Amino acid sequence: MNHKKKRFNKKKKRQRKRAILAIRILIVITVFVGVKFIPKRENKNLQIENNGTSDSEQSNNTEKTENKEEIETPKLDNSGYTSFEEDPNADDAAVVAANTKGLLNRTKTYPVRTDGKKVVYLTFDDGPSPTNTPGVLDVLDKYNVKATFFVVGTSIAANDQAKALLKKEVARGHAIGNHTYSHNYSYLYPNRVMNVNNIVSDLQKNENAMKEVLGKDFTTRVIRLPGGYWSWDGRTAMKEAMEQDGYYNVDWNALDKDAEGPKKNADQLVQCTKESVEALGPNADSVVLLMHDTYGKEETVKALPRIIEYLQSQGYEFRTIK
């Protein structure tokens, strides 16, 4: 009986030892696994810290990089002159030039626009002048209307006020066209024939004059030849030169006659404008109106509010040419 009891106790001790050994092995395995797991977690956390703690933070970092690139993009040195593509008030000079040319030489008839709108382009030649350009700009501001100024180099070079006015035209959202530097008919059109070399040289000289005021990156592809393109012989050679240099000449198909015949008062200029526009017919949907803001055109400034109101009453909206 004692012998059986001893064998039972020995067996129980062996089981206890095995259980203790199993527990120890389990503890060792647990510790080992924990040691292997913790560094991985730490490495993962370290990697996250290095790369960004979350997808949202990575997204923010990407946005910051993109914003930094946008900020670092150099701005054009052109006094803020916007391109045709960026200007909501501008129409394509290529289209306006083609439509006006077609209407003048009768290869096109109204309507010429494809959007159903009636549009008038107010254009002012020969400035800027300290006497009349400020008044024109003030009237345009009052009616929230944008215009296209065809400037002359000699007018720009005349004084610092004229230079400041050119900058003001740009700052107020108007379009700038090249009307040559000299505006000298005998130099540009000797014997009433276009001298292409002289014209191109004069246009380039005027663009350089504008760059000196507005900045080296300023450029305009819109030109208007003094007296109009169709007034002179030699147009074929000039057409080729314009195409080569990327110029678009935009003449006019309506005018207030402030540079024709005897000097007119404001009432007469308004009446001339009405007659000129009405002569285009009821379907006219693209009107390029010629006026001047140079010296001696005080009556044009006085007439301008009524001219704008008349055009508004006829359903026209005002756009620029770029």
Task: Report residues per predicted region.
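Catalytic domains of cell-wall/extracellular-matrix polysaccharide-remodeling enzymes
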Residues: 161, 183-290, 294-311, 316-317, ...
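Compositionally biased, intrinsically disordered low-complexity segments enriched
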Residues: 17, 49, 60, 180-181, ...
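Generic hydrophobic/packing signal
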Residues: 24, 36, 87, 121, ...
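Active-site beta->alpha N-cap acidic-glycine motif
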Residues: 86-194, 204-221
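N-terminal pre-catalytic segment of deacetylase/amide-hydrolase enzymes
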Residues: 2-8, 20-122, 129-135, 142, ...
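Functionally constrained cores in energy, signaling, and assembly domains
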Residues: 18-24, 36, 40-41, 165, ...
